[in-house]
Amino acid sequence: MATKFPKFSQDLAQDPTTRRIWYAMATGNDFESHDGMTEENLYQKIFATHFGHVAIIFLWASSLLFHVAWQGNFEQWIKDPIHIRPIAHAIWDPQFGKPAIEAFTQGGANYPVNISYSGIYHWWYTIGMRTNNDLYMGAVFLLILASVFLFAGWLHLQPKFRPSLSWFKSAEPRLNHHLAGLFGVSSLAWAGHLIHVAIPESRGQHVGWNNFLSTLPHPAGLQPFFTGNWGVYASDPDTANHVFGTSQGAGTAILTFLGGFHPQTESLWLTDMAHHHLAIAVIFIIAGHMYRTNFGIGHSIKEMLNSKAGLVPGTNSEGQFNLPHQGLYDTYNNSLHFQLGIHLAALGTITSLVAQHMYAMPPYAFIAKDYTTQAALYTHHQYIAIFLMLGAFAHGAIFWVRDYDPEQNKGNVLDRVLKHKEAIISHLSWVSLFLGFHTLGLYVHNDVVVAFGTPEKQILIEPVFAQFIQASHGKVLYGLNVLLSNPDSVAYTAYPNYGNVWLQGWLDAINSGTNSLFLTIGPGDFLVHHAFALALHTTVLILVKGALDARGSKLMPDKKDFGYAFPCDGPGRGGTCDISAWDAFYLATFWALNTVGWVTFYWHWKHLGIWQGNVAQFNESSTYLMGWFRDYLWANSAQLINGYNPYGMNNLSVWAWMFLFGHLVWATGFMFLISWRGYWQELIETLVWAHERTPLANLVRWKDKPVALSIVQARLVGLTHFTVGYVLTYAAFLIASTAGKFG
C-alpha cells in the first residue's frame, strides 16, 4: 500500500479520519515535530530551503521583466512617464465581450492589459534600463541565477556537502560574512552600478556591456581617489534645471550630498543615493571584520554578553546597557525560534520604515506623481509589516514554551522580564484603556455635536509637540522659529550645514507643499494618531501577554506542558480555554488588521486631499466619526459601486468584482469563527448520510471518515478568511478609488 500523506508523520498518515489532512497542514512547517528529525538535520534542511527561497524570488523577478518586455509599454512610457500608464501584462480572457475588451484596452496598447501599480517601471528607469532588450537580458540573467541557486540547494542536501551542526552554530564567522559580504559588498556593488550605469544614463550617456569597461564614470578617473582629493567627485553636480535622461543641465559629480529632490523627477538625487550606498558599504565591510573567528582577534560575542565591565574603564555594571545579559549567547544560538523572533521583529520594523520613506522621500524618478502606485506601495508595505511583527511575537512565545531554560538564564534580562510580567502587562492594559476611552470619547463628542448642528462645540486639539518637531526639522509654516527653521540657531550654523552641503536642498523640500515630506498637521491628525497609539498598544498588549504567559500563569501554572497551541484542559479545569499562546496570536491578528486599517485609511485620505488640491476636506471631516464614514469610505467607494452599472462596464469593473469577492471571503470567516464543532459535526454527518443514499453520487466514496475541525483549526480557517477578505476588500477600494480619480 502506498504511503499516505503526510510522509513526515507516521502517526498522522495512519489516521483513518479527515484529521489526517488538517493536522498534516497544521504541522507541515513544524519541522521539529517531524519523524526522525535531529537538530543537525533540521539546520541542514532549513539551510537548503533558503536557496530554494532565493531561487523563487529570482524566478518571480524574472517573470516581471519578461512580461513587461513582451507585453508592456516600457519604451513608450519612458518618453512620457507622467501621462502614460505603465502596463504590467496582457489579459487573455475567453469571457470578455466587446465592452470588456474596449474597457481594458488601455495604456496605449491595442489589446486588453493590466496596469502596473508596483513602481517597477520607475525603478528600472531610475537604475538605467532604457529598452525592452535590457529587460529581456535581465530576465534571462535572473533565470540562470535561479537555476544556480536551485542547484546549490539540492547540492547542500547531498551527504558530502551537508554543513555540520558546529558550522551552523559558529555565530561570529556567520555575522562577519553577512555584515561584510551580504550587506557590505552588495551595497558596494550597488553603488558601483549607480555610478557606472545609472548616473551616466540619467545624463543621456548609454553604458552597456559593449562600453562599460571603456567609459569613465567621472572625467578625472581614479586619480582623485588615490591622491586623497575626494572632493572632486562631489563638485559640479547636476543643476536644478537638469532634464532626467539627457545631458541638458547635467553635471559630472558622482558622490554628492545635495539634499532634497531633483526638481523635475521629484525623487532623491541619484548622486546622493550612490554616496549613501558607498557609505553603507564602508561601514558594513568594517563591521564584518569586528568579530572573533579562528584567528583569535576581534570581539567574542559571548564575552561581551557575559561581561560586567562598565563603560568607563575600571568601573562595573550589571552588563550591556547596565542590564544583565549573561547566558544569552547560548540561549540565542541554540534556539531557532528566538533567532526567528528577533529577525522578524527587525524586518517588520524595517518594512514599516520602507512604507514611510518610499512616499516621503521617493527614490525613483517620477514615482511621486504616480499616485495609485504610491498608495499601493505604502499600503502593501504596512500590511507586510504587521504580519512580520505578529510572527515575531508568535515565535517568541514558541521560544518560551520549547527552548527557554530557566537555569541557564538565571538573573538575566529574560528572567527579569518573566519575573515582573504582571507590571508590564498591567501597564500596557492601563495605557490601552486610557487611550481608548479618551480618543473614542473625543471622536464621539465631536460626532454628536456635529450631528446636532453645532460643529463649533467640537473639542479640537492642535498637535503642538509634533508641530514643534516638524519646525525643528525646518518647516517654517507654523512660525515656531526653532532649530532648523531658525537661520541663527546652532543647528543651522553648525558645520557642515553652514558649509551649504545638504541643508538648502532639504529646506526647499520640507517647505515645498507639493510633496509628502512632513505634511502639515492639525486636530484631525492629533486624534487619528491617538487612535493609532490605542491600536498599537492593544495589539502589543495581547501579544506580550500571550508570550509572557506562555509558560504558565496563576490560573494554569503548568501551561508550558501543553505546548504552544491547545484548546482547553478539559472540564476539570474550568476557564482554561482560550489562554494558549496561539490564542493570543489569533486575537492579536484582528487588532493588527484594525491598526493597519486605520493607518492606511488616514494615509490615503490625507493624500487624496493633497493630490486633488483640497486639503480642507480632510481637515474639516476627520475630527468626527461620520466624517470618516461618509467623506472617506462612502464617498470613495462610488467608483467601485459604479464598476458595473446599467450602461455596461469600465476598466474599474475588475476592482468592483474584487471588492464584492473580498467581502464574501471576509464574511465566510465568521461562519468558522462563531459556530463551533458540534454544529459542523452534525452538518457533516447529515451530508454524508444524504450522499451515501443518492444514486450516482454514492459511487464516489471519501476514503477518510469526515470529522469536524478542532476548535483551534476552525479558528485558523476563520482567521485566514477574515484576513484575506480584509486585504482583498481594501486593496480593491484603494486602487479603484485612486485610479478612478487620477487615471
From Swiss-Prot:
Alphabetized Pfam families for the sequence: PsaA_PsaB
Molecular functions per Gene Ontology: 4 iron, 4 sulfur cluster binding; chlorophyll binding; electron transfer activity; magnesium ion binding; oxidoreductase activity
Source taxon at top rank: Bacteria
A GO cellular component entry from the record: photosystem I
Sequence positions that bind chlorophyll a B3: M671, Y679
InterPro entries: PSI_PsaA/B (IPR001280), PSI_PsaA/B_CS (IPR020586), PSI_PsaA/B_sf (IPR036408), PSI_PsaB (IPR006244)
Residue ranges of the TM segments: 46-69, 135-158, 175-199, 273-291, 336-359, 375-401, 423-445, 526-544, 584-605, 652-674, 716-736
Chain residues that bind [4Fe-4S] cluster: C568, C577
GO biological process, one term: photosynthesis
Binding residues annotated for chlorophyll a B1, in chain numbering: H663
UniProt remark on cofactor binding: PSI electron transfer chain: 5 chlorophyll a, 1 chlorophyll a', 2 phylloquinones and 3 4Fe-4S clusters. PSI core antenna: 90 chlorophyll a, 22 carotenoids, 3 phospholipids and 1 galactolipid. P700 is a chlorophyll a/chlorophyll a' dimer, A0 is one or more chlorophyll a, A1 is one or both phylloquinones and FX is a shared 4Fe-4S iron-sulfur center.
Catalytic reactions on record: reduced [plastocyanin] + hnu + oxidized [2Fe-2S]-[ferredoxin] = oxidized [plastocyanin] + reduced [2Fe-2S]-[ferredoxin]
Cellular location(s): Cellular thylakoid membrane
Keywords: 4Fe-4S, Chlorophyll, Chromophore, Electron transport, Iron, Iron-sulfur, Magnesium, Membrane, Metal-binding, Oxidoreductase, Photosynthesis, Photosystem I, Thylakoid, Transmembrane, Transmembrane helix, Transport
Membrane topology: Multi-pass membrane protein
Its EC number(s): 1.97.1.12
Positions bound to phylloquinone: W680
Family in the record: Belongs to the PsaA/PsaB family.
Its job: PsaA and PsaB bind P700, the primary electron donor of photosystem I (PSI), as well as the electron acceptors A0, A1 and FX. PSI is a plastocyanin/cytochrome c6-ferredoxin oxidoreductase, converting photonic excitation into a charge separation, which transfers an electron from the donor P700 chlorophyll pair to the spectroscopically characterized acceptors A0, A1, FX, FA and FB in turn. Oxidized P700 is reduced on the lumenal side of the thylakoid membrane by plastocyanin or cytochrome c6.
Assembly description: The PsaA/B heterodimer binds the P700 chlorophyll special pair and subsequent electron acceptors. PSI consists of a core antenna complex that captures photons, and an electron transfer chain that converts photonic excitation into a charge separation. The cyanobacterial PSI reaction center is composed of one copy each of PsaA,B,C,D,E,F,I,J,K,L,M and X, and forms trimeric complexes.
Full protein name: Photosystem I P700 chlorophyll a apoprotein A2
Organism name: Mastigocladus laminosus
Protein's gene: psaB
